[in-house]
UniProtKB/Swiss-Prot annotation:
The keyword Zinc does not apply. It comes from Paraburkholderia xenovorans (strain LB400). Catalyzes an unusual C-C bond hydrolysis of 2-hydroxy-6-oxo-6-phenylhexa-2,4-dienoic acid (HOPDA) to produce benzoic acid and 2-hydroxy-2,4-pentadienoic acid (HPD). This is 2-hydroxy-6-oxo-6-phenylhexa-2,4-dienoate hydrolase. It catalyses: 2,6-dioxo-6-phenylhexa-3-enoate + H2O = 2-oxopent-4-enoate + benzoate + H(+). Inhibited by 3-Cl HOPDA. Homodimer. The record marks S112 as: Transition state stabilizer. The active site is at H265. GO terms for molecular function: 2,6-dioxo-6-phenylhexa-3-enoate hydrolase activity; 2-hydroxy-6-oxonona-2,4-dienedioate hydrolase activity; monoacylglycerol lipase activity.
Length: 286
């Protein structure tokens, strides 16, 4: 397996797109071949590398150019307050990144907020997307079975508003099914990321007031998506309800759904080996 590190793959690029002028986006890049852009979730301290370091090596070895993008207002990318729903604004930033790097088309892999970003990109820029891979994406409105917002989202906003090590631990306990994966190394790494950028936390809450989660819902437009789509979900997800996966399956013309048992909101991390195998097979053969 290719040995990669965060520092050896770390890069910056300035993007110019609606709402972004000479805006610094940080990303990690490795490999050659068709481009796969991986989009992280929206929890405090999230970033491309921390979300996908268990996936980048196998995808590079499979012959792909992999880009792990820090979304605007996260990790090492510039700070921002958003006046529109975050999935749409983030999708514009993905286009800006692709334009700056001369990438005509890319496959998108999106988890949670990153899934909402990928959905919006597929809707706004259908000629620029290859295949679409979603893991528990946000932006799909109410649930048939679960009260909204779910337990994990409530903890996420609590952590944004009152960041503490204990609240972070509580959120990760809801985030992951397998509690043995919540190591001191994982907790400390995420806590350090949260403390590094206090402005990002404040701006996220301001943005959420301007464009709350209810504005993210793109369910009515899912039928417009023409990209081949692979949906994955954790059966035990306590952030985004499993029935949202059925919404996607019912409404996207060319879609398939895989549900991982004993899995929370981070399928690509909790079940990395199986996730990598399934998605690489989808990219190669679907």
């Amino acid at each position: 397996m290719t040995a990669l590190t965060e520092s050896s793959t770390s890069k910056f690029v300035k993007i110019n797109e609606k709402g972004f002028s000479d805006f610094n986006i940080h990303y990690n890049e490795a490999g050659n071949g068709e481009t796969v852009i991986m989009l992280h979730g929206g929890g405090p301290g999230a970033g491309g590398w921390s979300n996908y370091y268990r996936n980048v090596g196998p995808f590079v070895d499979a012959g792909y150019r992999v880009i792990l993008k820090d979304s605007p207002g996260f990790n090492k990318s510039d700070a921002v307050v958003m006046d529109e729903q975050r999935g749409l604004v983030n999708a514009r930033a993905v286009k800006g990144l692709m334009d700056a790097l001369d990438i005509d088309r890319a496959h998108l892999v999106g988890n949670s907020m990153g899934g909402a970003t990928a959905l919006n990109f597929a809707l706004e820029y259908p000629d620029r997307i290859g295949k679409l891979i979603l893991m528990g994406p946000g932006g799909l409105g109410p649930s048939m079975f679960a009260p909204m917002p779910m337990e994990g989202i409530k903890l996420l906003f609590k952590l944004y508003a009152e960041p503490s090590y204990e609240t972070l631990k509580q959120m990760l306990q809801v985030f992951l099914y397998d509690q043995s994966l919540i190591t001191e190394e994982l907790l400390q790494g995420r806590w350090e990321a949260i403390q590094r950028q206090p402005e990002h936390l404040k701006n996220f809450l301001i943005s959420a007031q301007k464009a709350p989660l209810s504005t993210w819902d793109v369910t009515a437009r899912l039928g417009e998506i023409k990209a081949k789509t692979f949906i994955t979900w954790g059966r035990d997800d306590r952030f985004v309800p499993l029935d949202h996966g059925l919404k996607l399956l019912w409404n996207i013309d060319d879609a398939r759904l895989h549900v991982f048992s004993k899995c929370g909101h981070w399928a690509q991390w909790e079940h990395a080996d199986e996730f990598n195998r399934l998605v690489i097979d989808f990219l190669r053969h679907a």
